Amino acid sequence: MKAIELKNVKKSFKDGDETIEALKETNFSVDKGKFVAIIGPSGSGKSTLLTIAGGLQSPSSGEIWINGRALNEKKEKARAKVRFEEIGFILQASNLVPFLTVKKQLQLVDKVNKAKENRAGLDLLKRLGLEKLVDKYPEELSGGERQRVAIVRALYNDPTIILADEPTASLDTEKAYEVVKILAKEAKEKNKATIMVTHDLRLVDYCDKVYLMEDGRLSEKVD
């Protein structure tokens, strides 16, 4: 079953008198349980596609479907609910709440979602070497540590879809591989649809499919 689908999606914007096509007409889907990567040069439209897929920005035309429901037909409050309940975002900037400790970052997810403590999320903290940092504030963490906390936070809510924009950018090689292995495991064992934008071609071996984005046009990469 398709967890996420883009139908005839385009994105353009005005730059003075010129119209820039950030994303040319795109048809793209990811099934549950699949882990796909999108590669391509900077400025090619990868992040634009990801933010549209997650409903963080609207397309100029076309449709976004999340688990069989048309996302862009919903009002913003309903879209926000779908984003929170169905999608885990891992962005290049960790966007942690500056006045909350690592532990409280995760407790905030529990509070908003009215959920019980997520044991799997706490296990992820240990797996990523963060268990001794739970009482630290973001300013006390390195860039790589903040990014790893953001990854755990994104997975903590047990979303059905994971959208990761350069999730390993600030990590060393060992931790980068560990994160990608976790994303692959989440896809396979928990039947999640996962899309990862990356520049690191060493990491795509863990993916089921690899897509190439060039000049706003997406195509499946065939070796």
Question: Residue ranges of each PLM-predicted region?
Answer:
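ABC ATPase NBD coupling module
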Residues: 71-88
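Helix-to-loop junction immediately C-terminal to a conserved catalytic motif
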Residues: 54
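Conserved ABC transporter NBD signature motif
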Residues: 62-70
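Conserved ABC ATPase signature
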Residues: 137-141, 145-147
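Catalytic Walker B motif of ABC-type/P-loop ATPase nucleotide-binding domains
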Residues: 162-165
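A short, proline-enriched helix->beta-strand linker immediately N-terminal to the Walker B motif
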Residues: 156-160
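Short coil-to-helix segment of the ABC ATPase nucleotide-binding domain corresponding to the Q-loop/switch region
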Residues: 100-107
